[in-house]
Amino acid sequence: MFDVLMYLFETYIHNEPEMRVDQDQLTDDLAQAGFHRDDIYNALNWLEKLADLQEGENAPYFMDADPLAMRIYTEEEGVRLDASCRGFLLFLEQIQVLNLETREMVIDRVMALDNTEFDLEDLKWVVLMVLFNIPGYESAYQQMEELLFEVNEGYLH
């Protein structure tokens, strides 16, 4: 499913954000690109749930949290998000790329992935996808994009 999300983000969403695509046509295009239908449906469902999180009432755990409180991760979250991932999320909060709500959206979407393997690079892409899908967070998205691509470019040299 994560491969489908990455492909969608790089091919459709990031390059043509205003483009409207028929879901059936998109499913067929992705199947022709070699993705399994189950992965395609799971990825599209993942994106729908991301859109639902923006509504607020679908994620009531955002509402009562104290912004100064320290986030304690559940055992399952700690397994999926290792120390480097959790540290990176804290770093993103400290530099104000993420806030309480967007951090929780990222964690929610990470936990919804069906990957058995998940690392810091995957987390960076999930953060980018979440920020891209929230109106008004263009600056945070741009900062995250710079962080992602500056680090990746450093490996090429």
Curated annotation (Swiss-Prot):
Transmembrane segments: none annotated. Belongs to the Smg family. InterPro entries: Smg. NCBIfam families: PRK03430.1. It comes from the Bacteria. This is Protein Smg.
